[in-house]
Amino acid sequence: MEGFLDLYLELNVPSPVEEATWHRWFEVWLRELGVTDPCELSLCLTSDEHIRQLNREFRHIDAPTDVLAFAAEETSTPVELQKITGVRLLGDIVISVPTACAQAKAQGQRLSRELAWLASHGLLHLLGWDHPDELSLQRMLQQQHHLLAAIQEDLEVTHGQQP
């Protein structure tokens, strides 16, 4: 099952997480979520200015945010995992590294962990998860904790950054 993910990484700002690590994390998470068919997604690490433009254009909110997800398949519930022919296009995740850095600092955690948290959140959105109410949000956050636990050993490695 190795190599079932095509990950397109766009770095508009430096990343403390190496490309191979991002790839490994997404493959682990997809397996944890039961996705085994070949798929592709893109991850863009960017500035507050860029994510603000996207947020304004697509959500009509003129402010930066931490993460945006643009799913290739629109669904109101988590995607039913079914066998498909060919490669499944999941969509795009965009993360503001400056916002992630500020959030990591405020929470006293490493930037790599905050980036993983935001990326896992974006991935869940690509697969149809949403949080329109408190119960849905709690379920989604619980799933994110599960996904981060699956890569805990990687998160304990520094990835070239200060604690």
Curated annotation (Swiss-Prot):
Gene Ontology biological process terms from the UniProt entry: rRNA processing
Entry-linked HAMAP family: Endoribonucl_YbeY
Similarity comment: family membership: Belongs to the endoribonuclease YbeY family.
Organism: Synechococcus sp. (strain JA-3-3Ab)
InterPro entries registered for this protein in UniProt: MetalPrtase_cat_dom_sf_prd, YbeY, YbeY_CS
A molecular-function term among this protein's GO annotations: zinc ion binding
Free-text comment on the cofactor: Binds 1 zinc ion.
Main subcellular location: cytoplasm
Sites where the protein binds Zn(2+): H121, H125, H131
Protein name as it appears in the record: Endoribonuclease YbeY
PROSITE patterns: UPF0054
Cofactor: Zn(2+)
Localization of this protein: Cytoplasm
